[in-house]
Regions:
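N-terminal domain-onset segments
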Residues: 1-54
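Short, compact, well-ordered microdomains
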Residues: 54-90
Length: 90
């Protein structure tokens, strides 16, 4: 079976800590969605979770999850363990 290696790509990411800085994180996601011209509702911070609407449906980030801005400007959450295995700080 063929194997593939992930291309080295630099991404932007912020950790969701469910604290006062979460307002800034929500603004960052919403500003990015607006800049891309994506017709989805705004991200919201509800009951300690961050809800990120995407064209595929809502994604929920919990405390400690990383919010990634992908290569196409899309936003999605990533669990801390997966993030640590996949990314390193540049």
């Amino acid at each position: 079976m063929p194997q593939f290696k992930k291309k080295p790509v630099i991404i932007e990411a912020r950790q969701f800590n469910n604290d006062s800085e979460s307002y800034e994180l929500v603004h960052w996601v919403n500003e990015g969605q607006y800049a891309r011209g994506v017709d989805v509702p705004f991200a919201t911070w509800i009951n300690g979770n961050l809800i990120i609407p995407t064209l595929e449906g809502d994604h929920t980030a919990s405390t400690g999850d990383w919010i990634i801005k992908g290569v196409a400007g899309e936003f999605y959450p990533c669990k801390p363990g997966i993030f640590e295995q996949t990314y390193e700080k540049v």
